[in-house]
Amino acid sequence: MSGGVAQGAPRVGSIFGSRHLWRRLDEVQRLDRGRRLLENLHRTVVRLPTGGHNEAMTAILGLNAYHGDAAAALVIDGELVAAVEEERFTRIKHCAGFPALAAAWCLTEAGIGPAELDNIAISRDSRANAGHKLWWVIRHGANGRYLKARLANAARVRDVRSTFAGATGIEPEALRAKLHHVEHHQAHVASAFFVSPFEHAAVLSVDGFGDFTSMMLAQGEGSSFRVLDRVLFPHSLGMFYTALTQWLGFPKYGEEGKVMGLASYGDPCFLERMRELVVLDGDLFRLSLEYFAHEDGVDMTWHGQTPTIGRLFSDRLVETFGPPREPRSEITAQHENVAASLQAMLEDAYLHVVRMLWERTRIPNLCLAGGVALNAIANGRVLPETPFDELFIQPAAGDAGTAVGAAFWVWNQHLGRPRSFVMNHAYTGPAYSEAECAAAIASAGLEGERLDDDRLFAEIAERISMGDIVGWFQGRMEFGPRALGNRSILVDPRRAEIKDILNARVKHREPFRPFAPSILAEATAEWYEQDYPSPFMLLVYKTRAGKRERIPAVNHVDDTGRLQTVERRVNPRYWRLIKEFEKLTGVPLVLNTSFNESEPIVMTPQHAVETFTKTEMDILVLGNHVVRSGAACRVASEAVASAGVARP
């Protein structure tokens, strides 16, 4: 963003000068690690610039609130300035509720106050599809408790203006921003098309549900899109996948990705049974509702910190596939085969709709969003198996991304402003200075060394090649569920044993889940059967036959990888590290997994230090500061001594 943002910054007090936000932060303080969060936010306030509001500037705050993956995004004059999930602050995965801390950080990052916002957009509109909702209630009745919960959630959404004012410490009357309720799937569509590189595109949004819709098909032209079709409640590919995910013993919100990994171990021998659950009906699809419970009302909690969803499958599904697996119990061949069949059915239905969308638009460009668009296996089949030539997937394809979409819906669709922004990276979160990194290391009682770039990249590439586990913390944090080289744990992909070591010492996750490669973009065609850019780790490609044995740690059981292609112009530091590794090993890729252990991806240097100290990583890199532990420290010291180089 241009310097106009800093020039238009207000006084510090205009953002944080009241008791209301600090009362909210006091609530966070009662959470684990809340003290450090408060320290970080207080420190951020001190850094705010001063000045007056730039009257020519148009500032739009987008919110995903009262739903899983609560998030905020700030768009100023058509440019995405900041976007971040609430979970990164609260340290609660998929944090629901109102994203007060995420919104406050976005404003702080831009140096503006809540009173200077022109528009606030929330990716929910309880009025959307009102006629369909009423007709459904008349025909089916409604579970009283379920209906009460949905009405309460709708009331919270409608009251977002006063909630935001209270959270940010101003009177509602002082909030001059116009409030926009953007239909959930229109926000998804906007999040994909308006930030894509395409002037014209077909757009598909697929998830569980939002505003009574589970799928939206649209056509984007310039600075607007038109809705072509939609699938309404109770039919939903996302709900189908989540229901079977629950049956497979993964009941927590957001565990569908585990099933995608498990599916590769099974045989889709139950595919014909799955076709009884999902019927490809003409252009779209429908569910056989006797296998599901959500039509009758399922308890869902969105207003607290942790989102929850009640049981979505019916007794009929249990009769078909047997008793559901208990969480953390043994996974059998039956479970693997059901997972494989579930994934195959999802892919068939997904591609069926994609092909139909091409027939209706005949546009070569496709944009994808919605939680189902996080299914990288299905995405990887789109270009080879449909007529589309080009593809853009919103990096935060799940509901967090609707914060971005809601803001751009206002800028482009509502205000009619021309498009000027392309989301070619997802590094939109907080960044920290070298001094802050050093302070975090010192406050933990650790010894760190600051290296210049040449020494840093050479040493870390060498340590990775020698089998060390490296925590890599650089620049602005990623937005969305994937670590893309700024909040990552990196290891050598050539070592088959490193997966088990990584799980035992750091990640502690299920052994069937694959680890992903980050590869130099220019080397993709040499190592994988497809080479279309995959910057957000949302495409699965087959590994070339001659390369599989060389990178066993990132070659899944079905000879695939969910890869991130790394371009020098997008992330030069990450690209350089991988390039140094290639010089040492001849392999232009590293294993990249998210920098966390059973919690959200680390945001601050303090989070990174804490994860480093409670796990068994070998090296922590915060900017140019290196912390070595145990054997890694001894090996580094011996290398320095043998080279005759004095340690600073």
Positions of PLM-derived features:
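Intrinsic low-complexity, disordered N-terminal segments enriched in polar/charged/small residues
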Residues: 27, 38-40
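Extreme N-terminal starter segment of soluble prokaryotic enzymes
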Residues: 57-60
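Flexible beta->alpha loop and helix N-cap segments adjacent to enzyme active/binding sites
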Residues: 66-85, 90-93, 136, 143-146, ...
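N-terminal phosphate-binding loop and adjacent alpha-helix
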Residues: 88-112, 350
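Short glycine-rich phosphate-binding loop at a beta-alpha junction
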Residues: 114-125, 179, 362-370
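Adenine-nucleotide phosphate-binding core of ATP-dependent small-molecule kinases
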Residues: 327-353
